[in-house]
């Protein structure tokens, strides 16, 4: 499935919605790598073709654009030197005036913004204070008798006038403070702009900035390469750890036991009507032609019976019992309802309606995560998250009971979420 997406450079929006944030980041990173690889390959072919004379080098087209100088009365190019013309001010004076005007306008703009903020703060401050005081007075007014209400009203008006007077004083102090800040800021901006004008004549700063940007860009590329290498080393470590813990050995033992116990396998599939006992070492029926993607529930049910039942998908290891974590074709909302009242680490596996595979729904401390499991090939693996490939679906689940799914999330499968209704939601898959 991932190879098909990278080949077409397109992913279905419905399938994209099923991916988690980590899966989306990894998928977009892979697509960007594929774009760079194609571009480098095309550039190499073009260079090789030009070197061997198979393709002529690109020639710049002649431009129709031209420049025409303004001529004076004497027929020469018209030139005006600022500050040297009749009635012109000296260049230094013009420059000083421009800098002073820019500083004044900038300081005025900043002062207006500061005053708006200050005025809003003052208004809010006294509005809140007045509201609190009114609330206090209102509470007291309910306690007094009818003859005291007039006195309370007079007191309220006096307090209101006092607050208004204090507000006016605060406004005057705020305006004076803003005015002083405006003058100070105008002076600072004047000297800042003056120094910037003097320094702008040297080009060494621009050169150093360009070199610094280039250095940062190279450092960022190296950091991304190191992160990718660390991720590959982490995945390789998980694979080696799984081999050391006997996952592969257990898989071989399972196939040997299945090959030696055909009668037990026949009794298992005798319970499923219209399904013959398959051999554990043989592939799916070649008369079944799988579409590019699931089209309907009927097609998904047939795919499961034709391709997944022979691979014992959904069964416990070395038994004929269906795993407690296995569910049928249920929606994302139904899966989250089942996991709602369970603790962090609870999980279930449901048959996907978007891809040929499954969706592992995981319970977080707050919320849920959903991982797509690709089963379109001869193995089972998480789509875009974990490069490890597993021979059976049960191997994948058992592996991640001991190893986390993603390094960033630290998801570890702990408690399976079983069935709640009768018949179970997977009964159509085994009829």
Curated annotation (Swiss-Prot):
CDD domains per record: SH2_SH2D4B (cd10351)
Record keyword DNA damage present: no
Compositional bias per record (Basic and acidic residues), positions renumbered to this chain: 211-235
PROSITE patterns, per the entry: SH2 (PS50001)
Bilayer-crossing regions: none
Pfam families given in the database record: SH2
InterPro entries documented for this protein: SH2 (IPR000980), SH2_dom_sf (IPR036860), SH2D4B_SH2 (IPR035839)
Keyword set includes Transmembrane: no
Alphabetically ordered keywords of this record: SH2 domain
Domain SH2 stretches: 325-417
Region annotation (Disordered) ranges: 201-235
PANTHER family, alphabetized: SH2 DOMAIN-CONTAINING PROTEIN 4B, T CELL-SPECIFIC ADAPTER PROTEIN TSAD
Protein name: SH2 domain-containing protein 4B
Organism: Mus musculus
């Amino acid at each position: 499935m991932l190879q098909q997406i990278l080949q077409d450079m397109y992913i279905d929006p419905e399938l994209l919605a099923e991916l988690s944030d980590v899966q989306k980041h990894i998928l977009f990173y892979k697509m960007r790598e594929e774009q760079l690889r194609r571009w480098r390959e095309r550039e190499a072919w073009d260079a090789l073709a030009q070197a061997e004379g198979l393709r002529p080098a690109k020639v710049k087209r002649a431009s129709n654009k031209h420049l025409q100088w303004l001529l004076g009365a004497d027929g020469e190019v018209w030139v005006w030197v600022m500050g040297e013309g009749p009635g012109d001010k000296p260049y230094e004076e013009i420059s000083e005036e421009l800098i002073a005007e820019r500083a004044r306008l900038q300081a005025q703009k900043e002062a207006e913004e500061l005053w708006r903020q200050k005025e809003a703060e003052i208004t809010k401050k006294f509005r809140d204070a007045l509201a609190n005081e009114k609330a206090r007075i209102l509470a007291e007014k309910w306690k007094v008798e009818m003859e005291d209400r007039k006195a309370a009203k007079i007191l309220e008006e006096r307090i209101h006038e006092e607050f208004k007077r204090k507000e006016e004083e605060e406004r005057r102090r705020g305006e004076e403070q803003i005015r002083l800040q405006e003058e100070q800021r105008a002076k600072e901006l004047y000297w800042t702009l003056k120094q910037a004008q003097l320094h702008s004549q040297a080009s060494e700063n621009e050169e150093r900035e360009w070199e610094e940007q280039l250095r940062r860009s190279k450092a960022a590329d190296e950091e991304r390469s190191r992160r990718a290498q660390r991720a590959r080393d982490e995945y390789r470590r998980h694979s080696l750890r799984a081999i050391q813990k006997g996952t592969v050995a257990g898989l071989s033992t399972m196939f040997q036991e299945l090959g030696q116990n055909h009668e037990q396998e026949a009794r298992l599939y005798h319970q499923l009507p219209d399904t013959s006992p398959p051999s554990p070492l043989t592939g799916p029926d070649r008369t079944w032609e799988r579409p590019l993607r699931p089209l309907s529930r009927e097609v998904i049910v047939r795919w499961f019976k034709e391709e997944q039942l022979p691979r014992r998908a959904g069964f416990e290891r070395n038994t004929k019992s269906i795993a407690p974590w296995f569910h049928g074709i249920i929606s994302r909302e139904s899966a989250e309802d089942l996991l709602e009242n369970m603790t962090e680490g609870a999980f279930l596996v449901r048959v996907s309606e978007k891809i040929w595979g499954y969706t592992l729904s995981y319970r977080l401390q707050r919320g849920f995560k959903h991982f797509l499991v690709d089963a379109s090939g001869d193995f089972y693996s998480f789509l875009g998250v974990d490069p490890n490939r597993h021979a059976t679906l049960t191997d994948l689940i058992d592996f991640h009971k001991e190893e986390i799914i993603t390094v960033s999330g630290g998801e570890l499968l702990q408690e399976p979420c079983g069935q709640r209704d009768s018949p179970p939601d997977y009964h159509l898959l085994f009829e």
